């Protein structure tokens, strides 16, 4: 619109409590960056115009993602997108380009958000009645919502590869083509909002909680990651002469993730509910080990012996922040 082009295309401002609140948008005390003592002033939203796109599921609507800056136009040190950008810069200095893909699982409910809230979130009705994993008949029941999600995301410039039923009643997964770390994190964020908004428009509801029901499969966000040349044309994890096709660099990369698995889990499982997902016999990992094509390990080798070789971190739940998780 004209107002955006006149001013907001350069920047706009918002209350700085937005990076110091809880999941219910309540301000949380104890932060140096934003508090009642400091008066909850503004920070700057600087649009990243490379992320601008139409929002096909909403008439006359466009979307642009922003970097969060202070009044001197310096990135805030605690901005998740800024944290990832700094990590990417460090990786670039070493001559590497990180490529990522995140699988997103969620539960679809055959109720609206309002009706679920009215029943105090107790026993919401899932869109299906038994395990959907790779099932054809079951996922047809969910297709009106899933088709809309795939179609609209594709129209919004996100390269959807597929959706599929998962290991719970009404549980689905959406997969998109891998990309550089920042593009993938941006896409991940847009996908989650799109899924919830499209479901709302159809009178349905979606949750990305890691474990909304103790007796059902949790929802994960598996992160596929690999290193490439800066031009993105040479996979640096592949060595045709090495065991499994794993280059020395890849082995070092995996070793680092294993060594710090406990520390990075803070960003992969950020909430109390996140840890309820870690149950044996549910396809959620319970050991910080790596293995070749083994879905019970925290880190799974995929694409053995080929240029698509990568490591899949299976620790993360669907509730993770993609910017912090990728960083």
Language-model segments: residues:
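ATP/Mg2+-dependent ligation/transfer catalytic cores
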Residues: 1-162, 325
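Short, hydrophobic beta-strand segments
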Residues: 64-70, 172-179, 225, 313
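A generic structural motif
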Residues: 69-75, 138, 178-184, 231-232, ...
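Core alpha/beta catalytic barrel or barrel-like domain that forms the active/cofactor pocket
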Residues: 99-107, 119-136, 156-176, 206-226, ...
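Short beta-strand elements
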Residues: 117-126, 221-231, 288-290, 297-303
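Acidic, His- and aromatic-enriched active-site or binding-groove loops in soluble protein domains
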Residues: 121-146, 181-192, 196, 230-240
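Accessory "access/gating" subregions that flank catalytic or transport cores
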Residues: 137-142, 146-160, 174-181, 192-208
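C-terminal accessory/tail domains of diverse enzymes
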Residues: 183, 194-206, 237-327
């Amino acid at each position: 619109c004209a107002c955006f082009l006149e001013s907001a295309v350069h920047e706009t401002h918002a209350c700085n409590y937005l990076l110091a609140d809880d999941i219910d948008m309540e301000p949380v005390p104890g932060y140096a960056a934003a508090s009642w003592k400091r008066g909850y002033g503004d920070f700057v939203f600087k649009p990243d115009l490379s992320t601008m796109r139409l929002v096909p599921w909403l008439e006359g609507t466009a979307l642009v993602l922003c970097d969060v800056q202070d009044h001197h136009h310096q990135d805030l040190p605690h901005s998740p997108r800024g944290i990832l950008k700094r990590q990417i810069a460090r990786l670039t200095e070493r001559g590497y380009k990180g490529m990522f893909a995140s699988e997103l699982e969620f539960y679809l409910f055959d109720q609206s958000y309002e009706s679920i809230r009215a029943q105090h979130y107790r026993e919401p009705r899932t869109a299906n009645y038994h395990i959907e994993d790779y099932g054809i008949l079951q996922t047809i029941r969910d297709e009106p919502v899933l088709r809309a999600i795939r179609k609209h995301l594709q129209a919004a410039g996100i390269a959807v590869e597929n959706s599929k039923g998962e290991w719970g009643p009404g549980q689905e997964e959406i997969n998109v083509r891998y990309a550089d770390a920042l593009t993938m994190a941006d896409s991940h964020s847009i996908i989650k909002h799109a899924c919830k908004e499209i479901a709302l428009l159809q009178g349905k509801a979606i949750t990305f909680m890691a474990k909304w029901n103790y007796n059902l499969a949790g929802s994960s966000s598996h992160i596929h990651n690999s290193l490439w040349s800066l031009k993105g044309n040479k996979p640096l994890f592949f060595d045709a002469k090495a065991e499994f096709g794993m280059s020395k660099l890849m082995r070092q990369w995996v070793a680092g993730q294993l060594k710090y698995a406990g520390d990075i889990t803070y960003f992969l499982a950020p909430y109390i509910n996140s840890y309820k997902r870690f149950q044996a016999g549910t396809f959620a990992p319970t050991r910080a080990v790596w293995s070749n094509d083994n879905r019970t390990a925290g880190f799974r080798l995929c694409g053995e012996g080929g240029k698509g070789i990568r490591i899949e971190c299976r620790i993360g739940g669907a509730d993770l922040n993609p910017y912090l998780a990728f960083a």
